[in-house]
């Protein structure tokens, strides 16, 4: 099928009042720390870039898209733009794109990325007819780049300072070249940060134009509290306009960017409707695969009051259900755990025993069982606290960070800047 790429409202100014877009928030982890970015993304009341109220699994995202299209049939584009980086979450990103392409062959697909980890996926992106990719390139001089990025995490190794900026730039430019070889429309975002790169954005424009970039979005930096750059003011409109005019001599400019949330939906510039956000929240409460019937949550507990047992040490799991009025949860079963030993087979047996559970709440768990259970559609959540509070919170989509153990939060990948260590 030939896609009508003119209907992309972010790349075509004439389409933005007619066609809408939807960002599916399936990518919470990030592989770099920008000095202007606050990784606390779970917020309903802010509208800064990267914010989302929920994070979805790929199949939850498809369920949400189905409902969103009923409310806004003018949506022409499905994008993945965070709240982290799509290719720091490659499995979730690629599965989501595959699911959407299969069900909605006429839909435009796009991703927005920093480009660090994108290279291995470009060929499949082209096969899936991902027509538009946005790369954020804030500097082509590593001396400037090292002022913008606190760290870069690539192939499980940490990089800082100039080395980090050089690695990021190398991968960004290689990704841009490969995207153009595969015929993908490439937009480059370059964030104007006063006193840091405002005198350099034109050089970025010149470089990416020479490599075939289709459009540049020179957009003003968004001042965000609790960041390294929190004391840097946003650029004034005159500075932005001058940079856009000068860059416009090199390649076309996008001038209608709304610096969208990672869960933005509808016409650019319009606030997400309450009805649409209710559909997003509904999707987040579904099992990871909404087509499956998983009405329960399992818990590892020594005495039946607290979540205080390691997954591998539990000899039985308590199983809870949400009551019909959704005001409390009830213990409905107790299931024996498979005997110790057996490696992966043990965890596959546990997954079978808990096949009607959407999550298992434990004090801690190893990587191997987490991987097996996740592949079976069961979330493993490391939590400390009272069973009823935690189980009810998971069922109803509450923020449980106050109960989560630090190993579950993964500071350097998801909800805060961290220092980039301890991610795995």
Swiss-Prot record:
E.C. no: 4.-.-.-
Binding site for [4Fe-4S] cluster 1: 30, 34, 37
Positions that bind [4Fe-4S] cluster 2: 257, 260
UniProt cofactor note: Binds 3 [4Fe-4S] clusters per monomer. One cluster is coordinated with 3 cysteines and an exchangeable S-adenosyl-L-methionine. The two others probably act as substrate.
Gene Ontology molecular function, alphabetical: 4 iron, 4 sulfur cluster binding; lyase activity; metal ion binding
InterPro entries: Aldolase_TIM (IPR013785), Di-Nase_FeMo-co_biosynth (IPR003731), DiNase_FeMo-co_biosyn_sf (IPR036105), Elp3/MiaA/NifB-like_rSAM (IPR006638), MoaA_NifB_PqqE_Fe-S-bd_CS (IPR000385), Nase_CF_NifB (IPR005980), NifB_C (IPR034165), rSAM (IPR007197)
Pfam families referenced in this protein's UniProt entry, alphabetically: Nitro_FeMo-Co (PF02579), Radical_SAM (PF04055)
Record-listed S-adenosyl-L-methionine binding positions: 84, 136, 188
UniProt keyword terms in alphabetical order: 4Fe-4S, Iron, Iron-sulfur, Lyase, Metal-binding, Nitrogen fixation, S-adenosyl-L-methionine
Pathway: Cofactor biosynthesis; Fe-Mo cofactor biosynthesis
Gene3D superfamilies named among the record's database cross-references: Aldolase class I, Dinitrogenase iron-molybdenum cofactor biosynthesis domain
Cofactor section: [4Fe-4S] cluster
Protein's UniProt keywords contain NADP: no
GO BP annotation list: nitrogen fixation
Radical SAM core domain boundaries: 12-261
Assembly mode: Monomer.
Role description: Involved in the biosynthesis of the iron-molybdenum cofactor (FeMo-co or M-cluster) found in the dinitrogenase enzyme of the nitrogenase complex in nitrogen-fixing microorganisms. NifB catalyzes the crucial step of radical SAM-dependent carbide insertion that occurs concomitant with the insertion of a 9th sulfur and the rearrangement/coupling of two [4Fe-4S] clusters into a [8Fe-9S-C] cluster, the precursor to the M-cluster.
Cross-referenced PANTHER family: FEMO COFACTOR BIOSYNTHESIS PROTEIN NIFB, FEMO COFACTOR BIOSYNTHESIS PROTEIN NIFB-RELATED
Family statement: Belongs to the radical SAM superfamily. NifB family.
Name of the protein this chain belongs to: FeMo cofactor biosynthesis protein NifB
Biological classification of the source: Bacteria, Pseudomonadati, Chlorobiota, Chlorobiia, Chlorobiales
Gene that specifies this protein: nifB
């Amino acid at each position: 099928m030939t896609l009508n790429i003119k209907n992309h409202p972010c790349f075509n100014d004439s389409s933005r009042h007619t066609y809408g877009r939807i960002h599916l928030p399936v990518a919470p982890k990030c592989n770099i720390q920008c000095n202007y970015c606050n990784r606390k993304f779970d917020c309903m009341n802010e509208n800064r870039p990267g914010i989302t109220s929920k994070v979805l699994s790929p199949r939850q995202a498809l369920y949400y898209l189905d409902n969103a299209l009923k409310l806004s049939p003018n949506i022409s584009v499905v994008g993945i733009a965070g709240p982290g980086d799509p290719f720091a979450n490659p499995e979730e990103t690629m599965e989501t794109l595959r699911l959407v392409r299969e069900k909605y062959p006429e839909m435009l697909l796009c991703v927005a990325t920093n480009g660090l980890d994108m290279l291995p996926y470009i060929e499949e992106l082209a096969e899936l007819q991902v027509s538009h990719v946005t790369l954020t390139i804030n500097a082509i001089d590593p001396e400037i780049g090292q002022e913008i990025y606190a760290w870069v995490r690539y192939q499980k190794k940490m990089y800082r300072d100039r080395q980090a900026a050089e690695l990021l730039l190398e991968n960004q430019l290689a990704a841009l070249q490969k995207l153009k070889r595969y015929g993908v429309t490439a937009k480059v975002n370059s964030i104007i940060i006063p006193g840091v790169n405002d005198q350099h954005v034109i050089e970025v424009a010149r470089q990416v134009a020479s490599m075939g970039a289709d459009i540049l979005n020179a957009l003003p930096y968004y001042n965000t509290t609790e960041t390294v750059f929190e004391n840097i003011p946003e650029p004034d409109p005159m500075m932005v306009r001058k940079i856009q005019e000068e860059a416009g001599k090199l390649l076309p400019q996008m001038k209608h960017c709304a610096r969208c949330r990672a869960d933005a939906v509808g016409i650019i510039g319009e606030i997400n409707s309450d009805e649409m956000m209710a559909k997003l929240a509904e999707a987040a409460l579904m099992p990871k695969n909404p087509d499956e019937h998983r009405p329960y949550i399992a818990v590892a507990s020594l005495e039946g009051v607290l979540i205080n047992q390691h997954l591998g040490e539990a000899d039985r799991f308590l199983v809870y259900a949400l009551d019909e009025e959704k005001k409390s949860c009830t213990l409905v079963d107790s299931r024996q755990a498979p005997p110790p030993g057996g490696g992966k087979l043990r965890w596959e047996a546990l997954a079978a025993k808990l096949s009607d559970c959407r999550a298992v709440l434990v004090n801690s768990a190893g990587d191997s069982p987490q991987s097996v259970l996740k592949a079976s559609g069961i979330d493993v959540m490391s939590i400390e606290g009272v069973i009823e509070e935690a189980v009810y919170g998971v069922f109803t989509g509450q923020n449980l960070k106050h109960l989560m153990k630090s190993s579950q939060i993964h500071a350097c990948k998801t909800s805060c800047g961290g220092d980039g260590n301890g991610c795995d």
